[in-house]
């Protein structure tokens, strides 16, 4: 799901940069975890993320504590895109807690995220899964937190040059909760 979230964020940024709807859209990848998470961050940089930050944490933490720690390091952002499933416990609750921490709108469990084809709307059209196989279509305006399912997008393949550059790219590491 995190790879799908990265692809959604890259697609939104590509669209905004191509259409001039934003000064410059950047994709900043942020994770909370031990040093071994740097490999995943390097993969994200190779795929097109502009910067990566790891909030250092070596122990398993409550989802709300994770959200608070991430919110402290998000900085100025319009949109946060998360995977809807975490590798640790798989609760998918971090995006909801994060939206609360950031006082942002939230759209969770998304199957599809569409950027507007024309520049008449700043809203993203999203499709989310409901119980019983039903779907809900929403228009989401930033600031917002989105969580996407793994099926929402397939991550683009990184070029060899980008992969090699990512191996030595800086990853900012900040102290997290312990």
Language-model region placement:
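A glycine-rich helix N-cap at a beta->alpha junction
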Residues: 32, 38-73
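Conserved acidic residues
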Residues: 50, 78, 143
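Short beta-strand-loop elements within alpha/beta enzyme cores
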Residues: 76-86
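Short Gly/Thr/Asp-enriched flexible loops that form oxyanion-binding sites at enzyme active sites
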Residues: 89-106
